[in-house]
Amino acid sequence: MSIIRDVYAREVLDSRGNPTIEVEVYLESGAIGRTIVPSGASTGAFEAVELRDGDKGRYLGKGVQKAVENVNQIIAPEIIGLDAVEQVVIDEMMIELDGTPNKSKLGANAILGVSMAVAKAAAEALGLPLYQYLGGVNAKQLPVPMMNILNGGAHADNNVDIQEFMIMPVGAANFSSGLRMCVEIYHNLKSVLKEKGLGTGVGDEGGFAPNLGSNEEALQVIVEAIEKTGYTPGVDVKLALDVAATELYDETEKLYRLSGEGVVKTAAEMVDFYEELINKYPIISIEDGLSEEDWDGWKLMTERLGKKIQIVGDDLFVTNTERLEKGIKQGTANSILIKLNQIGTITETLDAIEMAKRAGYTAVISHRSGESEDSTIADVAVAVNAGQIKTGAPARTDRVAKYNQLLRIEDMLGFTAKYLGEDVFYNL
């Protein structure tokens, strides 16, 4: 019933107008799985390789025809005839077929496209929603949104150094209420910015991208928007940051350059800076507060702040069990950001989440800045009971698609749906 009959890939566009790969898997039963692979702007050096063509005369070198060809001519013949429910077997076969530690031969984008499409096809063949197929009967926890409403860094053309300023509706009773709270705050933030004569254009992930006097001013206008909406900062809504500090790090001088503020800081001074911010504002989570290779700095940050806030490793861990294991052994961070295309298969993604949870780390499921209408990560978040999701502002269809899928899942789960609010930070 779930035997793979055909696999087909094509080149499509992502939310930034860059080419990406779409894969379709057809089963003998008539079931079809279709998925579009995302792409990042601020990427970790240790991520699996996203294969691009490099032909400057076509899509400025960003075409993915090589990845498409690898699916259609190399991967497809190997997996046609296999059972789509054998996810681990298929993923491991593709990893072996690639034969490199970072999937640079076939491309993580090619491999992930097939991996996700296989899972979707198998779920359809069995008549199950994807979250239940991947997570089983216990998949019932809706994630707290970590909604990016103000963009800086590599996600915007402004003078704000910190890449993402996010809100988390920890006081909501359920997911739909939490989403509504975030949307209301987002619209009120637009009003606050307009009143101050600031720009309301948006960045890659739909958050506003104004020029501000400092990174702290971003927190100030967000708190103002929360209060204007009628919610209490720190009670109903908490704040989260993605600093993307690797983008700020001068490898030669071992210093962090906050160009927007015209200052340079050591790792210890960055930790001091974060401590000042969390003492003044209701910040519950900081992602990539230091560079991906500044392990000593990360250890210091975890020692200083790890009992107060969630410290998330994105570029640090890149959804990779080897790097996560190193972090766990060193006592580095207390949370991992999960991006499927950083590692390249469903199986390896689930392995990373399992390792994190066993070590008492939280797991945050995340989109990329280059997204599409594909909503797979919404199902993954519920499948693994992650409890948190990053998928941008309520302003672009590529972001809203994930929120809408979570609303559908909440409806499907009915009274069995869970929403933990602040209890998702179980290790603080």
UniProtKB/Swiss-Prot annotation:
Lineage top rank: taxon: Bacteria
Annotated positions binding (2R)-2-phosphoglycerate: Q163, K339, R368, S369, K390
Gene Ontology terms: biological process: glycolytic process
Cofactor(s) this protein requires: Mg(2+)
The UniProt record lists the keyword Nucleotidyltransferase: no
Amino acids binding Mg(2+): D242, E287, D314
InterPro entries with a match to the protein in the record: Enolase, Enolase-like_C_sf, Enolase-like_N, Enolase_C, Enolase_CS, Enolase_N
Biological function: Catalyzes the reversible conversion of 2-phosphoglycerate (2-PG) into phosphoenolpyruvate (PEP). It is essential for the degradation of carbohydrates via glycolysis.
Family: Belongs to the enolase family.
Protein's name in the database: Enolase
Lineage: Bacteria, Bacillati, Bacillota, Clostridia, Peptostreptococcales
Protein encoded by which gene: eno
